[in-house]
Structure formats: C-alpha cells, structure tokens
Amino acid sequence: MAKKSSIEKNNRRRKMTKNAAPKRARLKAIIADKDLPMEERFAATLKLAEMPRNSSATRIRNRCEITGRSRSVYRLNKLSRIAIRDLGSKGLVPGLVKSSW
C-alpha cells in the first residue's frame, strides 16, 4: 500500500492539471504560432513558465485505484497487476480465467 500522502499529492496534481489545461493549451498555441511577433510569443513563454509545475500533465503518475501502487498499473482499468490477480481469483473481473495447461 502506498503512502496516503503520495496518493493525495497525485490527486491534487490531477485536479490542478484539469483546471489549468485550457490555459496551458492557449499559451502553447501562442508559442507555436510562427505568424505572431516574437515579443508576444516570448511573453506567452514567460506566462507558461510562471504556472505551477504540478499543473503539467507530465507530473501525474498512474496509480492503482485500490492499492495506490505506482508500478505495473494497467491503464485500461487503472489497477495494478497484484490487484487484478486478487480480484480475478475472487471472480470479480469478468472474463478473467486462471490459466492451466
């Protein structure tokens, strides 16, 4: 089980990213637009740099919804391999069958 502080920190980052996404997208579009004057693009770069680091999507870590584990997490269902195995052995994951040969 991951530390609660790590899980909460990641959740805060998700919220910040969601709130700041439109503003970041606008600033990035201004920076990428070669038709605008250089001063305006540079000002947009400075505004983007002033935004909080945690509002960037790269700072988000994929974590298991059940355990908070950060490694070996499947994006499709947001569960770690260990959680999938436990739920599968209890029969709670539809279509998951223990292999035998």
From Swiss-Prot:
GO terms for molecular function: rRNA binding; structural constituent of ribosome. It comes from the Bacteria. One of its GO terms (biological process) is translation. Residues 11-23 have a biased composition (Basic residues). InterPro entries: Ribosomal_uS14, Ribosomal_uS14_bac/plastid. Gene3D superfamilies: 1.10.287.1480. Residues 1-10 have a biased composition (Basic and acidic residues). Pfam families: Ribosomal_S14. GO terms for cellular component: cytoplasm; small ribosomal subunit. Keywords: Ribonucleoprotein, Ribosomal protein, RNA-binding, rRNA-binding. Residues 1-23 are annotated as: Disordered. Part of the 30S ribosomal subunit. Contacts proteins S3 and S10. Belongs to the universal ribosomal protein uS14 family. Binds 16S rRNA, required for the assembly of 30S particles and may also be responsible for determining the conformation of the 16S rRNA at the A site. HAMAP family: Ribosomal_uS14_1. This is Small ribosomal subunit protein uS14. It comes from Rhodopseudomonas palustris (strain BisB5). The gene is rpsN.
